[in-house]
Swiss-Prot record:
Gene coding for it: gltX
Source organism: Rhizobium leguminosarum bv. trifolii (strain WSM2304)
Signal sequence, renumbered to the chain: none
Catalytic reaction equation(s): tRNA(Glu) + L-glutamate + ATP = L-glutamyl-tRNA(Glu) + AMP + diphosphate
Name this protein carries in UniProt: Glutamate--tRNA ligase
Pfam families linked: Anticodon_2 (PF19269), tRNA-synt_1c (PF00749)
Motif ('HIGH' region): 12-22
Entry-linked InterPro entries: aa-tRNA-synth_I_cd-bd, aa-tRNA-synth_I_codon-bd_sub2, aa-tRNA-synth_I_CS, aa_tRNA-synth_I_cd-bd_sf, Glu-tRNA-ligase_bac/mito, Glu/Gln-tRNA-synth, Glu/Gln-tRNA-synth_Ib_cat-dom, GluQ/Sye
A GO CC annotation given for this chain: cytosol
Major localization class: cytoplasm
């Protein structure tokens, strides 16, 4: 594997809470750059205009900084190959699309969403994987010009060889062969003029002189499209490395429905960023038992991409807890520990906001732990009996919790007003009084029916912590339902 003049990148999409999987891939790239004296670049891939938000972009940058990762170039600090936000690079992509059209490597497609869905349904019914059937491939230049002049919506798709296979060497998987007839005629430029991930990432990687592309294994099947684009443009392709996905202990894909996946969740609960990076870094090195506690510098020294395993990286929270505890006890001095605790308590003004809400609700300072302590707890230790005093039957409580969890994910800006508005809307949709809906939420979020105002508490705790507490509450109530 050539490593001269190494430039690597992490290119997250700002469409939600920053995922630990992003930290996992970012850390690999960061360590790879450090190992080879290269440069680590941050690029924001916000081609999904409907889901990307400045708020989530800020959270991505803050989360990666909290992890202790530093980039040489990025949207916040600039660099010689900017802009580093794909939406700001939009004018750059169209000329490359026109080049592909002129060379006969791409074509305009006028198929409507309805027609494409009918096509996919027919393919699925026939037991075939859905992919574009090439209807617009045979359009003449005159037909294309006429339909565009008539104002028909068009996208640009890439042409794919009809036979043979794409053979390449991956830095992790070794020699890979993917038949061309399994590769879709990918949309390159969407109807709004924005490029898809496949088009933008190839162009950006080339223009930013990226030498090694390390990303999750879910992109392995897309490599033929990317290699083909490099060939169409006459560019040298980077070295591809596809890392095994992080998985739960049961080998299922890591997802927020089963375990907390957002970096902010671990930050909010008081995990040490060095411990989280230590935990993730262990997936990239080989060590003996007893050598697990490692700083970033030590991880970099032991890092060897040649020894990567294709086996899934198991995200074992118990091991993370163990490692985090060792960091607190063995790596932090008494002064550092006290400083970390104070910084954590004041993070996002959580403690200050809790004190402000508590002041008018207590008669003695000693009442604070019972009233506001839930804001700083990692685990409320909810039991089925905690919900027994709620007037609603357990079946109704469980229905409320299971309805609220996914609906809260629809909130774009997480604050008191949006939380209240969504919960009121949920109550209306369920045909229930707001009090009936929020009563179990008080217990789920704070562990008690007497607590600080619910909407304020949820806003202070943050989306990721609330998500996890609602999930654990639903499990407790499900046990109550099952015991009847």
């Amino acid at each position: 594997m050539t490593t001269s003049g190494v430039r690597v990148r992490i290119a997250p999409s700002p469409t939600g809470e920053p995922h630990v999987g992003t930290a996992y891939i970012a850390l690999f790239n960061y360590l790879f750059a450090k190992k080879h004296g290269g440069e680590f670049i941050l690029r924001i891939e916000d081609t999904d205009a409907t889901r990307s938000t400045p708020e989530f972009e800020t959270k991505v940058l803050d989360a990666l900084k909290w992890c202790g990762l530093e980039w040489k170039e990025g949207p916040d600090i600039g660099g010689p190959y900017g802009p580093y936000r794909q939406s700001d690079r939009k004018p750059m992509y169209q000329p490359y699309a026109e080049e592909l059209l002129d060379k006969g490597h791409a074509f305009r497609c006028f198929c409507t969403p309805a027609r494409l869905e009918q096509m996919r349904e027919a393919q699925r019914a026939a037991g075939k994987p859905p992919k574009y059937d090439g209807l617009c491939l045979s359009l003449t230049a005159e037909e294309v010009t006429s339909r565009m002049a008539a104002g028909e919506t068009t996208v640009i798709r890439m042409k794919i060889p009809a036979e043979g296979s794409c053979d390449f060497t991956d830095g992790v998987y070794g020699d890979v062969s993917i038949p061309w007839d399994s590769v879709d005629m990918q949309v390159l430029i969407k109807a709004d003029g924005m490029p898809t991930y496949h088009m933008a990432n190839v162009i950006d990687d080339h223009l930013m002189k990226i030498t090694h592309v390390a990303r999750g294994e879910e992109w392995l099947a897309s490599v033929p499209k990317h290699i083909l684009l490099y060939r169409y443009f006459g560019w040298d392709q980077p070295v591809f490395m596809h890392l095994s996905l992080m998985r739960n202990a049961d080998k299922s894909k890591l997802s927020k429905r089963k375990n907390p996946t957002s970096i902010s969740y671990y930050s909010a609960l008081g995990y040490i960023p060095e411990a989280l990076m230590n935990f993730l870094g262990l997936f990239f090195i080989q060590i003996a038992e007893g050598e697990e506690l490692l700083t970033m510098e030590e991880l970099s020294a032991k890092f060897d991409p040649e020894n990567l395993s294709k086996a899934g990286a198991i995200f074992d929270i118990q091991k993370l807890d163990w490692l985090n505890g060792r960091w607190i006890r063995e790596k932090l001095s008494e002064e550092e520990f006290q400083a970390r605790v104070l910084a954590w308590a004041m993070e996002n003004d959580r403690l200050k906001a809790g004190l402000r809400l508590s002041q008018t609700r207590i008669s003695k300072l000693g009442e604070l732990p019972d009233l506001a302590g839930f804001l700083l707890k990692s685990d409320l230790g909810l039991q089925p009996s905690d919900f027994a005093k709620i007037k609603s039957p357990p079946e109704e409580i469980l229905e409320i919790l299971n309805t609220v969890q996914p609906d809260l994910e629809k909130i774009l800006e997480w604050n008191v007003e949006t939380i209240e508005a969504e919960l009121r809307a949920i109550a209306d949709r369920m045909g229930k009084k707001l009090k009936v809906v929020v009563s179990p939420l008080f217990v789920a979020v704070s562990g008690s029916s007497r607590s600080l105002p619910l909407f304020d508490s949820m806003a202070i705790l943050g989306r990721s912590v609330v998500r996890q507490r609602l999930k654990l509450a639903a499990q407790a109530v499900a046990a109550l339902v099952g015991s009847k």
